[in-house]
A protein has these predicted regions:
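Short, solvent-exposed loop/turn and secondary-structure capping segments
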Residues: 1, 31-34, 42-45, 59-60, ...
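Conserved oxyanion/phosphate-binding beta-strand-loop segments in alpha/beta enzyme cores
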Residues: 1-16
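Short alpha-helical segments and helix-capping/turn motifs at coil-helix boundaries
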Residues: 13, 27-30, 63-67, 82, ...
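Active-site core of glycosidic bond-cleaving carbohydrate-active enzymes
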Residues: 15-27, 36, 73, 77, ...
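Mobile, glycine-rich extracellular loop/lid and propeptide segments
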Residues: 26-29, 41-51, 64-72, 83-86, ...
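Active-site rim segments in enzyme catalytic domains, especially the processed small/beta chain
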Residues: 43-46, 55-59, 75-78
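Primarily short, surface-exposed interaction patches in extracytoplasmic proteins
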Residues: 48-54, 58, 63, 154
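Beta-rich accessory regions
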Residues: 350-432
Length: 432
């Protein structure tokens, strides 16, 4: 917190300005801070909102008192929604919603690479961003996710019309979903589309006197030719294989687009077994946990432990990629404890931990303990769970159930069990 050192304005609000970048940190770093130091996360969120108030837009990246490059969506919206649904107090969420709505409605002009939503006019008119605008693919996907974040805050503040509008808009990722495209045994991918709605099998990266300027685009296309900046790709730092599985706010909708549970499970297996999963970057962070939505949380745990064993160690190069302001190490920390957040929502997925016991010492003076019984390399499957002495059948736990204190006990065994077939129930007693 650099309050008092800010040369641009003086007030009593916290001032954090080293965000590098929220695209990296919103998935794991921010949720971990919320869990272990909620006062700090409250100040960070207040700072984001105050930057909007004083400087015009919340940042995606910021350093040296200036908003920097946007990478995907206007991801500060997810940070605000995450704080809101987890009940962090002392934040002006009405003003926060104003900041979110400015991102979602006001074009940032020639600052579109530094703040706000680039390609916003097309997104609002077409429901997607057409190829030719940098990062059209992941911007469409992430704006949809950010719209869900807006809907969540609007609903909590009693703004029903806004809630319905942005909930509907959060489905815009489907407008780039090409149902008939097949690759490596999977069908349906997020792929380039032009302004007229045509799907593009061939794309132009730019003009060159050396190389052919038109290339076939496939779900494994990751980089362009040498003369193309990496930030001008259809997806930012990822492939369609990765982003077509990165719909954290609507996993049931994703499963439906993939052809149902059986085909989705087969697709996940192809994703991991064929090497399309990228351990060293953020777009795939949630993917190992997607088996939870198939009533098979034990398969999520198997994937997670395999990934950690192959890619993490305690040597000088112990992380598989850039830590990105704690994003990579926070992913590991959560999985060592047996929890994993779905940012912008109020729950954590439960997996087999690597640690026999974890104790959270909460701000309210209480503690929350995660304990295991019989955990070993052989006994790696959860057989049953109790929360504060009561049978707990769900494979996720709400934030409020952690911060009120208590104990989650995981009984382990050698074989997969029937535990955890239900993720959680929402307010309408429907499956998440």
């Amino acid at each position: 917190d650099r309050n008092g050192e800010n040369p641009l304005w003086a007030d009593n609000e916290p001032y954090y300005d080293d965000f590098y970048a929220i695209w990296d940190t919103y998935r794991t770093s921010s949720p971990l801070i919320t869990l272990i130091d909620p006062k700090r996360e409250t100040d960070i969120v207040r700072s984001l909102i105050n930057i909007y108030k004083r400087d015009g837009y919340m940042p995606d990246a910021r350093s040296g008192n200036c908003n920097g490059r946007t990478q995907g969506g206007s991801n500060a919206e997810i940070v605000i929604a995450d704080a809101f649904v987890k009940g962090l107090e002392g934040i002006d969420y009405e003003l926060g919603l104003q900041a979110m709505l400015k991102d979602a409605t006001i074009c940032p002009g020639d600052r579109h690479e530094a703040e706000g939503r680039g390609g916003l006019t097309h997104y609002l008119q077409l429901g997607y961003i057409p190829y030719g605008i940098p990062r059209a693919g992941n911007r469409t996907v992430e704006y949809s996710y950010c719209d869900y974040a807006i809907a969540s805050v609007a609903k909590g503040l009693g703004k029903e019309d806004l809630y319905q509008h942005y909930l509907k808009q959060s489905g815009n990722w489907k407008n780039l979903w090409r149902d008939d495209y097949e690759h490596a045994g999977a069908k349906g991918f997020i792929l380039p589309r032009d302004e007229k709605g045509n799907w593009l099998d061939e794309i132009t990266f730019g003009k060159s006197n050396i190389q052919k300027p038109t290339f076939t685009y496939t779900p494994v296309t990751f980089e362009g030719p040498w003369y193309t900046p990496w930030w001008d790709m259809f997806f930012y730092e990822a492939s369609s294989w990765e982003y077509s599985l990165s719909i954290p706010h609507d996993v049931p909708g994703l499963i439906e687009k993939c052809g149902g549970a059986e085909k989705f499970e087969a697709r996940l297996d192809i994703f991991f077994d064929r090497g399309f999963f990228n351990v060293n970057n953020e777009p795939s962070f949630l993917s190992p946990c997607l088996y939870h939505w198939l009533e098979k949380p034990y398969r999520s745990s198997d994937r997670i432990h395999e990934i950690i064993a192959k890619n993490y160690n305690d040597g000088p190069i112990g992380l598989p990629g850039n830590d990105d302001s704690g994003a990579m190490s926070s992913w590991l920390a959560f999985h060592m404890m047996g929890l994993y957040p779905n940012a912008g929502q109020d729950y954590y997925l439960i997996n087999t931990p690597l640690l026999e016991e974890t104790i959270f010492r909460l701000d309210n003076g209480k503690t929350f303990k995660i304990s295991t019984q019989g955990l070993s390399d052989k006994n790696r499957y959860i057989q049953s769970v109790t929360l504060n002495g009561e049978t707990y059948p769900y494979s996720a736990i709400r934030h409020k159930d952690i911060i009120t204190g208590g104990e989650l006990i995981l009984k382990m065994g050698k074989k997969p069990s029937e535990w955890g077939k239900q993720l959680l129930l929402n307010e309408e007693n429907e499956k998440l």
